[in-house]
Amino acid sequence: KEGYIVNYHDGCKYECYKLGDNDYCLRECKARYGKGAGGYCYAFGCWCTHLYEQAVVWPLPKKTCN
């Protein structure tokens, strides 16, 4: 599974500005989803890879980013 890491409180994606390989995104993806996860910056959001199937990613149901 893959997807954007999401803030549970406001429903927003984790933003990033350095596209491609990104230490911040990699660190956040691993912290949330475990050391097997990967991450990089895609379309100014942190995109996480190698997630377990039940991982919660953006968008959150009934929670829009505002």
Curated annotation (Swiss-Prot):
Expression across tissues: Expressed by the venom gland.
InterPro entries for this protein: LCN-type_CS_alpha_beta_dom (IPR044062), Scorpion_toxin-like (IPR003614), Scorpion_toxin-like_sf (IPR036574), Scorpion_toxinL (IPR018218)
Every LCN-type CS-alpha/beta domain range: 1-66
Biological process, per Gene Ontology: defense response
Single GO molecular function: sodium channel inhibitor activity
SUPFAM superfamilies: Scorpion toxin-like
First-listed, main subcellular location of the protein, grouped into a coarse class: secreted
Gene3D superfamilies from the UniProt entry: Knottin, scorpion toxin-like
Cysteine-cysteine disulfides: 12-65, 16-41, 25-46, 29-48
CDD domains in UniProt: neurotoxins_LC_scorpion
Alphabetically ordered keywords of this record: Amidation, Disulfide bond, Ion channel impairing toxin, Neurotoxin, Secreted, Toxin, Voltage-gated sodium channel impairing toxin
Any one Gene Ontology cellular component term annotated for this protein: extracellular region
SMART domains: Knot1 (SM00505)
Subcellular location: Secreted
Residues recorded as bearing Asparagine amide in the entry: 66
Domains (record comment): Has the structural arrangement of an alpha-helix connected to antiparallel beta-sheets by disulfide bonds (CS-alpha/beta).
Family indicated by similarity: Belongs to the long (4 C-C) scorpion toxin superfamily. Sodium channel inhibitor family. Beta subfamily.
Function noted in UniProt: Beta toxins bind voltage-independently at site-4 of sodium channels and shift the voltage of activation toward more negative potentials thereby affecting sodium channel activation and promoting spontaneous and repetitive firing. A mixture of Cbo2 and Cbo3 is weakly active on the human voltage-gated sodium channels Nav1.4/SCN4A and Nav1.6/SCN8A when tested at 200 nM. In vivo, is toxic to mice when intraperitoneally injected.
Miscellaneous field: Negative results: a mixture of Cbo2 and Cbo3 does not modify the currents of the human voltage-gated sodium channels Nav1.1/SCN1A, Nav1.2/SCN2A, Nav1.3/SCN3A, Nav1.5/SCN5A and Nav1.7/SCN9A.
Full protein name: Beta-toxin Cbo3
